[in-house]
From Swiss-Prot:
Spans traversing the lipid bilayer: none
Membership in a protein family: In the C-terminal section; belongs to the RimK family.
Matches recorded under InterPro entries: ATP-grasp, ATP-grasp_RimK-type, ATP_grasp_subdomain_1, Peptidase_aspartic_dom_sf, Put_Zn_protease, Rimk_N, Rp_bS6_RimK/Lys_biosynth_LsyX
Region listing for Alpha-L-glutamate ligase, in residue ranges: 165-464
PANTHER family membership: RIBOSOMAL PROTEIN BS6--L-GLUTAMATE LIGASE, RIBOSOMAL PROTEIN S6 MODIFICATION PROTEIN
UniProt enzyme class: ligase
Keyword Transferase set for record: no
Name listed for the protein in its UniProt record: Probable alpha-L-glutamate ligase
EC number: 6.3.2.-
UniProt keywords, alphabetically: ATP-binding, Ligase, Magnesium, Manganese, Metal-binding, Nucleotide-binding, Protein biosynthesis
Keyword field contains Cell inner membrane: no
Binding positions for Mg(2+) 1 per the UniProt entry: 412, 424
Organism: Desulfotalea psychrophila (strain LSv54 / DSM 12343)
Binding-site positions, Mg(2+) 2: 424, 426
Length: 464
């Protein structure tokens, strides 16, 4: 009984610190259901020091703040297979370091893991609390809060490391999740990241000195450009990408690849020519052809897609022939180009999305449309979950990206009775749904792919 009284009562979340890691404050989720403790770590690299294996890593201790970085080094005491929140097993490095909580200090073991998709940068498990702490789930920060002012004094924003690349993100809306993640991921790795609003870029056509300007500044010193666009502005964005190429600047997806994938009709024709199966699809330029067009794809129900659709816009399920004719005539009256496509009933509204980077499928999710909706893009309230793909699906995704010449692409696949069918290939993958569903640092993988193409290597920590 006296031993229980000596234990400290803590809440479901608490502020703590790691003096030897240089982390003065980090909020932890307290979970007795988890055996091990874990801390958010990125850019994890091992190295040798005095004949022992060490690990260097970076911690973003504050939630929703990637500019605050603490760089750490500790000896590796173990490597363990841990099951993550998605139910997948992964191998993690284990370190031992002193934890400070309410003026008490003791050593705990921490696994290093990317916790970007989690609500907390740290998880305090039961092994670290054994014989010391008691949890009251009704409490939060029972040992005291840390103010924003205190955090501001404790941490300083780090400047970009010298020797990194200069990378431009060519897009329209800087505040979008994917653009923010790419900017943050690049800065984490020591690169100078620039957001380039497509509408504020202009170019100079010249045989000897081609140029691109942005807000009056000449962009001739970029190492790489990553173009993230919607299909409605593909022509101008493609022209800008082509101009960067003529200046000798590396573009992650070439202008020709962006152009091909941005034209849905042309891309489907190219994919079919390469032997890739798609749902039966029709296209016409006149509403007079609506009835025959509907029969061409097997009749209603069928799918109607706007050629210029993006971020989940466009796909509509027409359940009857009359509804299909009405929709086709309406869109044609509005001079909107569209495709009609066979409806795959057995798919039950589920679409497989594979993310391809440099010839590898690095992540895959299954997207399910919200009730009453057809599009399952996460921008439209659809649900995403991690899924293991088959060799046939993997081969299809890789071939589709290769046919269109894309180094970075999302490939949408639908499963039919005849096997997997390709729906669409996008040169500007939406990152939010796939990062949240998989817990993977997809933005970091994209930046890493640029580093590999340009043969840039991250400086290793100095060995003593």
């Amino acid at each position: 009984m006296s031993q229980d009284i000596a234990k400290k009562i803590i809440g479901s979340e608490e502020w703590c610190s790691f003096p030897e890691l240089g982390i003065p404050a980090i909020k932890a989720r307290v979970d007795s259901g988890a055996k091990t403790s874990s801390i958010h770590a990125v850019n994890i690299q091992t190295f040798q020091r005095d004949g022992e294996e060490w690990v260097s890593f970076e911690v973003h201790p504050l939630r929703i703040d990637r500019r605050t970085v603490v760089r750490c080094q500790r000896p590796v005491i173990d490597k363990r297979i841990i099951k993550n929140s998605s139910g997948n097993s992964e191998t993690r490095f284990v370190i031992r370091t002193p934890l400070k909580l309410n003026k008490k200090v003791w050593d705990i073991e921490l696994t290093l893991s990317n916790r970007d998709a989690m609500g907390f940068r740290m998880l305090l498990g039961r092994e670290a609390m054994m014989d010391r702490l008691i949890i009251d789930p009704a409490l939060q920060c029972a040992l005291g809060e840390v103010s924003k002012e205190s955090l501001g004094k404790a941490y300083t924003k780090e400047e970009t490391r010298k020797g990194g690349l200069k990378i431009g993100i060519l897009a329209c809306n800087e505040s979008l999740y994917g653009n923010q993640r790419l900017l943050e991921a690049g800065r984490e790795r020591g690169h100078e990241m620039l957001f380039l609003d497509i509408k504020q870029c202009y170019l100079k056509l010249d045989t000897l000195e081609p140029e691109v300007h942005y807000k009056g500044r000449l962009l001739n010193d970029l190492d790489a450009v990553l173009t993230k666009i919607g299909s409605n502005i593909t022509p101008y964005a493609t022209a800008l990408s082509r101009q960067f190429e003529s200046m000798g600047i590396y573009t992650c997806n070439s202008s020709s690849a962006i152009s091909q994938s941005g034209d849905k009709l042309f891309s489907l024709q190219l994919l079919l020519k390469s032997g890739i199966n798609i749902p039966i699809t029709g296209f016409a330029n006149s509403p007079i052809d609506a009835s025959d067009l509907i029969e061409m794809v097997g009749g209603a129900p069928l799918i109607i897609k706007l050629l210029e659709g993006g971020q989940g816009q466009g796909p509509i399920l027409a359940k009857t022939k009359n509804a299909a004719e009405s929709l086709i005539n309406t869109f044609k009256f509005l001079r909107a180009n569209l495709l009609v496509q066979q409806f795959i009933k057995e798919a039950n509204g589920k679409i497989l999305r594979c993310l391809v980077i440099n010839g590898k499928v690095v992540a895959s999710i299954e997207r399910t449309a919200a009730s009453g909706e057809l599009s399952s893009n996460t921008h439209q309230d659809g649900k995403s979950s991690i899924v293991k793909i088959t060799p046939e699906e993997r081969s299809l995704a890789l071939k589709a990206a290769k046919v269109l010449g894309l180094q970075i692409a999302s490939v949408d696949i639908i499963n039919s009775k005849a096997g997997p069918l390709l729906l669409e290939v996008n040169s500007s993958p939406e990152l939010e749904g796939i990062e949240i569903a998989t817990g993977k640092d997809i933005a970091g993988m994209v930046i890493s792919s640029i580093e590999k193409k340009l043969q840039w290597k991250r400086p290793l920590p100095q060995q003593s």
